[in-house]
């Protein structure tokens, strides 16, 4: 049994997934305009721990974490480097995978790019 603190009700509650045996998690990922920093690594690590705990408890986990590939910071970076947004996002997504991989963070089940879903 997994018990979680519900900040809305301010009570501990027994976790019951919507679909028995399966947990679906969505976590907002980084804006990929530069290399990650500790603020980007922290949620990747934290939610990796949550995911692994659910898996340890026997749940199938569907973990989705997006890449924000449209943003004012990204447009500014594109102009600074005189490179396309796609070139920049491809570079920093690759670097993100390398960096979180070095931290032993498991890859998400899916990493959609925001631009593909607007």
Curated annotation (Swiss-Prot):
GO molecular function, a single term: cysteine-tRNA ligase activity
Enzyme class: ligase
Alphabetically ordered keywords of this record: Aminoacyl-tRNA synthetase, ATP-binding, Cytoplasm, Ligase, Metal-binding, Nucleotide-binding, Protein biosynthesis, Zinc
GO biological process: cysteinyl-tRNA aminoacylation
Subcellular location: Cytoplasm
Family matches, as InterPro entries: Cys-tRNA/MSH_ligase (IPR024909), Rossmann-like_a/b/a_fold (IPR014729), tRNA-synt_1_cat_dom (IPR032678)
GO CC, alphabetical: cytosol
EC assignment: 6.1.1.16
Pfam family for this entry, one: tRNA-synt_1e
Location (main, coarse): cytoplasm
Keyword GTP-binding in annotation: no
Cofactor: Zn(2+)
Motif 'HIGH' region in this chain: 30-40
Catalytic activity field: tRNA(Cys) + L-cysteine + ATP = L-cysteinyl-tRNA(Cys) + AMP + diphosphate
Binding-site list for Zn(2+): 28
Family statement drawn from the similarity comment of this UniProt entry: Belongs to the class-I aminoacyl-tRNA synthetase family.
Protein name: Cysteine--tRNA ligase
